[in-house]
Amino acid sequence: MKKILILIAAVTLSMASFAREYSHDKDILYKGAPDGYTEKMCRIDVAYEKGGEKRPVIIWFHGGGLTKGKRSTPEALQKNGAVIVGVGYRFVSEVSIPETLDDAAAAVAWTLKNIEKYGGDLSKIYLAGHSAGGYIVNMIGLNKEYLAKYDIDPDRQIAALVPYSGQVITHFAQRRKQGIPELTPPIDHLAPLYLVR
């Protein structure tokens, strides 16, 4: 029995040695705050491993229909050692979609300026997001104007866009604001499909 307990302890300890230990810096303001709402929403969290070689960086935009949701650094993304930047942004109930997209671009700019101190590799910057976050990723990655405002060229400085379930037509939040019927799929300057090159 004693040998079995020793074996179980050894296996458990060896498994723990393979578990990744992430540090977390939270609630970092990434954009000048002209008002209380911007100061509250334009914040990021960074999850990273200390020491070692430079690591890929995933800038993660949460979902929520552009009207709700919360920034996060998903645990599923922390399994391979990447630095994860979870971005909060202002919702379209309070600002326009272009202002929300500018928040996202400002978060990317903050990341490019600061991520090396977290072990991030500037040659491996990935923009990723789910649902509304996927829409944001497509819009700021395909419409160069958003990132260009911050002297960023997505063709040179972003390794890939990884949108999960992001809308590619004009976002439903914008269609609702304009009174466009739900089954009408407009493709205008606020649609990733309009920007495909």
Predicted regions, residues:
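Primarily recognizes the serine-hydrolase "nucleophile elbow" in alpha/beta-hydrolase
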Residues: 109-176, 188
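Serine-hydrolase catalytic core
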Residues: 186-197
